[in-house]
Amino acid sequence: MVEGQEGVTWEHWLALAEACETAGLDGLFRSDHYLSIVRGGEAGSLDAWATIAALAARTERLLLGTLVSPVTFRPPAVLAKSVATAQEISGGRVELGIGAGWYEAEHEAYGFRFPPVGERMDELERQLEAIARLWDTDPSAWPKPRPRPRLIVGGSAKPRTVRAAVRFADEYNTVFATPEECRERRARVDAAAREAGRDSLTFSLMTGAVVGRDHAELDERIARFQEVRGRPGETPHVTGTLDEAAARLREYEDAGVERVMLQHLDHEDVDMVHALGELARLVS
């Protein structure tokens, strides 16, 4: 998972996508922001769905999607059409992560409304319902995306987000959580699904990662991570040599996590993508 708002150029995206395919990774997900979180207006950002559509034409097997597209950016018909277009270009490899939006400074900078969280949650539910209708039954919305893109909703498993996910989504994605927190959050999602009389959602995790093939490589990457992040002393939940990171991922698997999206903050470090591919083979 790449933070596209942190100055990731088209050349970077091409290199990252090629590395993901070569390394054997399942997918390449990106954030959907217009303003840098770390550097404010000093870093550029390409539009998420334009980027995904372009990458869909340049890749062969990678899953592509957002974590997550804010409902405050686009009307639901525009978002549904953008995703459906990318789905056709990709031959069925696109997934939509969608959320209520949180980055107030970004909304102010670009002129988006940023209502209170309750209103944003109302809009999330409205857009989920509208997108499902546009993709499935609305007679005016053609072509229908086939297969239907998976819908991902996530957060920290608070009641309202879980209810929305259970009504409309295929997957619940929690973020930056320990294995113990994942176990608790999965239990809440599963309980809500049972109460609604539906099958369990796929339960996934998005969290940061810094890995190295040995401790020297790892130390270099940790130093670079802290420089990019601007927070000395901070390390992500999945940090270590390949063997150490594999052991950590097995802890998440034991806690009920079925899929992991590892956040890669240093988009110029393409070699770490290959290291993540080696890590994936260790735990497959």
Residue ranges and their predicted role:
Residues 1-284:
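Active-site-adjacent structural elements that line small-molecule/cofactor binding pockets in enzymes
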